[in-house]
Each structure stands twice: as C-alpha cells, then as structure tokens.
Amino acid sequence: VWQKVITDVSELSGLPNNALGLMSQAASQKKLKGYLINLEIPTYLAIMTHCDNRELRKELYLAYGARSSRSGPGGEKYDNTEIISELLEKRQDLAKVLGFENYAELSVAKKMAGSPEEILSFLRELGGKAKPQAEEEMKQVEIHAREVHGLEKIEPWDHSYYSEKLKQDLFEVSDELLRPFFPAPRVLEGMFEVARRLFEIDIEENNNFVTWHDDVLTFNILRKGKVLASFYLDLYARENKRGGAWMAEGRVKRINLQGEKQEPVAFLTCNFSGPIGPNPALLSHQEVVTLFHEFGHGLHHMLTKIEVAPVSGINGVCWDAVELPSQF
C-alpha cells in the first residue's frame, strides 16, 4: 500500500491546517514523526487541490491512478489485470447463456434504458453539449496558470490545483473556508431535522448496537414512538476501508415465514475527513452534499411501506431510476 512520510512541513506548503492536522494525526497513530501521506481520498484531494509541491502532486497522482495494476504501488502483488480480464470473459459467457449478444444487453434488460445503443446515443448527445463548456473552462485554467503563475504546460496533476487558484482569484472563495460552517454533529442535526419535517419522523442515536469501529454511529428512525428502521453511519476514511460513499442494505423490510414484521436496517458509509483530536470533523460542502445524497438512498430503503422483500425499498427499482430518491 502506497504511503509516504514527510518530516519537512515546507514540502506541504499550501495545505490547509485541517489537512495538515489529519496527516500529522495519521503519522502519530502509526508512531511516526511528521506527516503521513496516503491514497485515502481526503489526503489525495487535499494534496491535489492545495499543495504547492508540484513533484509531490505528480507522485501522488501517478500512484493513485496506478492502483491495483502491475505499475502501481506493490507491483504485481496487487495487480487486478487478470481478474478483470476473467470477469469480462465470464460476463460475456453469462450473457450468451441467457440469450444476449453481450453483457451490456444483459445489464440493460433490467434497467429503464431500452438498449445499449440508446445509452450510447444519450452519452454522445450529453458529451456534445458538455465538452465545449469543459474545454472552455480548461482553457481558462491554462491561461490563468500561464499568465498568473508562470506555468507553461499544464499536466494532469496540475488541473485541480490551478482550478482552485482560479476560483480563489475570481471569487475569493475556497471549500476550506467553508469547513468551519459544517462541523459533522451540526450537519447531522440539520439533516435529521430536514427529514423530520419532510417525513414526520424522529431520529435518535441508539448505542446498544455493536459496531466494527469506534467512529461508527447507530440510530433508530421512529414515528410516534414506534421504531420504523435503524441505520449505521460510518463517516470517516481510514486505512483498509473501501473508498467512496454508498448505502447498503443490512436488512430489508418484510414479513418473515413466521408472520412477523421485520424492520429494515441500512449501512450509510462515506470517506470524509475525520476529526482531529477532540475536535469534531469539519466537512467540506461537497461532503455535506454527499452525505445528504447517501441519506436519501437510506430513506428510500428504510421508509418503504412494502413488506415483500424482492420489491421492498430499493429492491426491484432499476439502477438508472434508483438515483432519484437520493437527490433528497
């Protein structure tokens, strides 16, 4: 697993104090001195967006992009090339057995889109409209990097950094300046209040659940004192945790074989910047948006009235339709 320890803080110039604190804390937890740089998304984004050290940005960018490949950290030990090739072959075999020409047709059969061609047509149309705007914005970043910062040629590891510089120069705003407005406990309080107003529910912490990490919080959803559902909330990035953000079913709402009602349980998982010492985690605006998004999926799963498991909650909903409730 790729990681790097930096002892000279000048090599990390430009990084916000929050990011430096997380890296220092990560090093201390491993009994190391200095700042631990790894490929966890809060660290990666902080370096790519704010760090003045171009060589470090390049090193991190290449390591991140080569994960699980023979050219990545760990070499062939973590190379997934053969696994991916085998997966593609077996998907094609499965599609043929089920009467489809390819796996794309099999996948689309369970979705709203009519065919792979329809999806490609949609993507080409979307790309045709979005690409000119993206190219214009990228051109502005390149001009700004050249004329203001003296960079002749912009590389992939420069994009986020100089986009942030342009945003600061044009609008005098930065995501880091917004973090103090979004302490995690206050964000949860506000999100739960929105849900209370919209759905007439109460959300209460329940410490009786056993969890897999001290960071994990557990809650019950109630209406008029009756428990409707429960969920686990695992917000922060940590070593060996799967990246990204998602909602997963722990248990679906259903009537079991004994005729008893089973209430749903959800897992809401993110990889946000964690707390530093005794202080609460300060979320970025994008992390707040992500949290609301995943909570939307969770509400879809947990507030269902359907008691037949295959069509309860998110089950039986096409994957290209299931994102609608997540826009909560």
Predicted segments with their positions:
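Propeptide (latency) domains of metzincin metalloproteases
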Residues: 36-37, 48-50, 59, 100
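Active-site-proximal, well-structured secondary-structure segments within enzyme catalytic domains
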Residues: 2-38, 85-86, 90, 96-274, ...
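His/Glu-rich zincin catalytic helix
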Residues: 41, 49-54, 218, 237
